Amino acid sequence: MTSREQLVQQVLQELQDAVESEGLEGLVGAALEAKQVLSSFALPTCREGGASPQVLEVDSVALSLYPEDAPRNMLPLACRGEGSLLFEAASVLLWGDVGFSLELRARTVVEMLLHRHYYLQGMIDSKVMLQAVRYSLCSEESPEMTSLPSATLEAIFDADVKATCFPSSFSNVWHLYALASVLQRNIYSIYPMRNLKIRPYFNRVIRPRRCDHVPATLHIMWAGQPLSSHLFRHQYFAPVVGLEEVEADGAPGPAPAPPALAPLPPPAKTLELLNQEPGLSYSHLCERYSVTKSTFYRWRRQSQEHRQKVAARFSAKHFLQDSFHRGGVVPLQQFLQRFPEISRSTYYAWKQELLGSGTCQALAPKEVQVLGELEQLPEEQMAKGLGCSSLAAASPSMVLMQRAKSYLEHCISLNTLVPYRCFKRRFPGISRSTYYNWRRKALRRNPSFKPAPALSTPGAPQPASVPEEALLPWKGEGGEGAGKATAGGPPAPHEFLPPKVPLSRWQRRLRRAARKQVLSGHLPFCRFRLRYPSLSPSTFWVWKSLARGWPRGLSKFQTQAPALGKGGLREAKEKQEKEAGRDVTAAMAPPAGTPLHVGASPGEDPGKAQGGPSGEGAMAQGRPHSRSLSSRPVAEAAVGGGDGQVLVMDMLATTKFKAQAKLFLQKRFQSKSFPSFKEFSALFPLTARSTYYMWKRALYDGLTLVDG
């Protein structure tokens, strides 16, 4: 019977023969055959044959490079072999000798070939690993290595895989990742306290690709030739074992090395220096340590002094926003007494930003009462709700967060779901992820929550609910129009329509300025979203269509409906200029059984907002009431005018685009080939990076993005 060593030698020989073929097709075929051979026997879990392990020797070079932040009471050992000794080090750690190094090499080659896409793009740490690969051939960070394209990295990967088939080759970072998957163990990659600019990419815990149990951890150290006090060149890997393991194995004590670790030169603890001396400048630091300017400022942002300044600035800004939403701005003197570290110019810049954003909405008496009750919560209850101490909850930012969380929980307890855009207007300092986390927890506490239907028939009994004035989640959504009903039908009941509030002077001025710039053609969409975040994207496209003179009156929805008369077309053409600033929600969700209404400006005559008898009003009345609610708003919005058509098509395209992106990520996740953000953004360029990582985190947490 063929022995284990002969089978491994045969597998390696077949892989070496396949290297000569062009491309990776022959090598992948040989890897599939090698997998069948190697799967016939598993790696042993303990030493076979009862032979005593080889005499352990401490690697003095690796010991002098052993970093201070690595695990204590451990020693790097010396290995015998060729190349970078990665597989020899793993064999010594697991079985006490280098007898299984060739088998580990063969299994690693098979792993890297059969899961090539995973190691290049699919895994969570792929970006960190690829960055480490860029720096593995140099000791300093350089622009040339940082800008290596993905095609070059794939070529390096293929060359490394082919070279790994030969025992004298050198290993790279992805060999560590593949070896961790082969051994089903974590690998603690210990990197010396040298090459500080690239050290974070190498000094980390590497986890296997898939593991069904809680994995143990192997410690492997990067060792090599020291070049200076802060530089070294990697040459080989050294196994690191604990002192108690050496004593338990009965191995003779390491005679050449002293029992205690020799004192190492102190590393460059720049972050601690910045915490001790906040005024430390880069010119003083670069004389003592090899630190680039970008690294220095990144560490400076992490220093304690900078974090305190950022926290104080955050609290001051949200205190000013809170006072502004209450109906008035705190005077400068009172603001400086409370926050003396904030400058006068910063105060006026924030004040002008608040006044120009158009978010100042008058609070209704009921809402003031609700917010007043939320403010009267005791500090212990606030601290309990946010999971922090009462001293931390007393800060203005914690008070704002507690008020926002209590407001959202109160709305859900009243069977009302506040959309994020309305919640953002009320509490601009709360992020989207925080809002959805709070909403998910509040919905779990209220299992009987059922949101009220958006449309209902006039004859159906209305459930008892809290008056909308107590919550006012939709008050800030109104456009310039007040929403008038068209002729040809009875006016809609008041309880079916969302409350409308006329726009303030600042909002009208803001919309006029934005509309003028869009119509002039000098404001692109990206700059429009940055300069006017309170205006919806559909408003931009409506104004853009007016500027370009697009024929928006004809659509596939209108071709299926009766043709408009000449008078109706003329009136619709004259109304396009006035309908550009109307409220979006008024065209999206008209009540069932009522005719479509179009927006009109506050000073416009209601009669002008109506279409002709043979135009929009007649078409809206001709719709049967048995029609489904899902298609009714789409058709009516398209018939009612160009604004509704552009808005509906924009919303449908956005919804379909997001659904396709979610389905794409979910399918790739199920097929174990999750795409990187670069690949994902090439297919879905309009999806933000934060949205991609939010969906990725949800999939890895076991959630489902798309049902069905």
UniProtKB/Swiss-Prot annotation:
Region entry Disordered, spans: 473-499, 561-636
Protein name (record): Vertnin
Signal peptide: none
Compositional bias ranges of the Basic and acidic residues kind: 568-582
Membrane-crossing segments per the record: none
Domain of life: Eukaryota
One Gene Ontology CC term in the entry: chromatin
Gene from which the chain derives: VRTN
Taxonomic source organism: Ailuropoda melanoleuca
Family membership noted in the UniProt record: Belongs to the vertnin family.
GO molecular function per UniProt: sequence-specific DNA binding
One example of a Gene Ontology biological process annotation: regulation of transcription by RNA polymerase II
Upper classification of the organism: Eukaryota, Metazoa, Chordata, Craniata, Vertebrata
InterPro entries, alphabetized: Trp_repressor/repl_initiator, Vertnin-like, VRTN_OTU_dom
